[in-house]
């Protein structure tokens, strides 16, 4: 429930019943560290200052995976938080956890709160919406791939504008290599940027059954010719120095920070 990143992220509601009191504490487990963690604290502080009925208590629980597994363990121990942030990779897990979560669409219906899923971007809510159109969770900190490039290295290579297509990525990278760059580009979160988002951009599903939303008997379609061709191309570029693999998740970012690679996403 968006993850990626990271990580396409969302808030999966697992609201526990509490007795009425002067100020109800709402514990919110999240996976936002560093600057994003500070922002989460600001959001909570602003909300707390805006009214006197509820007190949001944000709690950092580590990585996306650690936060989700911690929430599952807490639920089994009957010590779950009121709200937990779960990345999109955990969507299927949350969809199958009927008793662990309170689906947002049902929560809003039961509490008679005004709620319109169309207020959110369909490309984002699609991650967390069933085939019947029911939104299971609220998008939060949803991610999208962004291309970063080093302007100084581009200027040295005589490149005026960043590439907009994979063909242009290859052409620009060759110019960068010719100007002395050690590699053209690297990427982070490869399965997300080079499979999932590549598929979305080219309207190629990563799985059958409506990308898994239509049933549990779902199979991946990584062997689709579009994916195979793209990954083969990445392998070719890697051998030529156009692309350099820097590791899983965000481990490839230092290749850009140190100016070894002129671009990253």
Predicted segments with their positions:
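Gram-negative bacterial Sec-dependent N-terminal signal peptides
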Residues: 1-21
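Conserved N-terminal structural module of periplasmic/extracytoplasmic solute-binding proteins
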Residues: 8, 21-98, 109-116, 161, ...
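Alpha-to-beta junction loops
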Residues: 75-86, 100-102, 181-183, 258-265
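Hinge/lid segment of periplasmic solute-binding proteins
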Residues: 87-144, 170, 196-200
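Short, solvent-exposed loop/beta-turn-alpha elements that line the ligand-binding surface or hinge
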Residues: 105-120, 204-229
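Extracytoplasmic/periplasmic solute-binding protein
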Residues: 131-140, 145, 170-219, 261
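Glycine-centered hinge/linker elements that transmit conformational signals in sensory
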Residues: 173-175, 215-246
């Amino acid at each position: 429930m968006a993850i990626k990143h990271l990580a396409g992220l969302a808030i999966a509601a697992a609201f526990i019943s509490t007795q009425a009191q002067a100020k109800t504490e709402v514990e919110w487990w999240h996976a936002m560290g560093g600057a994003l963690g500070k922002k989460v604290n600001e959001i909570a502080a602003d909300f707390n200052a805006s009214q006197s009925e509820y007190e949001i208590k944000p709690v950092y629980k580590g990585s996306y995976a650690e936060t989700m597994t911690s929430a599952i363990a807490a639920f089994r121990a009957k010590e779950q938080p009121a709200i937990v942030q779960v990345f999109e990779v955990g969507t299927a897990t949350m969809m199958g956890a009927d008793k662990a979560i309170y689906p947002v669409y049902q929560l809003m219906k039961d509490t008679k709160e005004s709620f319109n899923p169309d207020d959110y971007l369909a490309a984002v809510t699609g991650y967390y919406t069933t085939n019947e159109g029911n939104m299971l969770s609220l998008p939060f900190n949803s991610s999208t791939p962004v291309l970063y490039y080093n302007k100084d290295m581009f200027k040295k290579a005589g490149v005026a504008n960043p590439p907009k297509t994979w063909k242009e990525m290859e052409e620009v990278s060759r110019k960068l290599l010719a100007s002395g760059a050690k590699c053209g580009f690297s990427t982070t979160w490869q399965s997300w940027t080079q499979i999932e988002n590549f598929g979305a951009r080219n309207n190629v599903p990563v799985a059958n059954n409506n990308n898994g939303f239509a049933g549990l008997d779902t199979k991946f379609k990584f062997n689709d010719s579009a994916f195979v061709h793209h990954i083969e191309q990445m392998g070719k570029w890697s051998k030529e120095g156009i692309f350099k693999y820097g590791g899983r998740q965000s481990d490839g970012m230092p290749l850009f920070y140190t100016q070894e690679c002129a671009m990253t996403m």
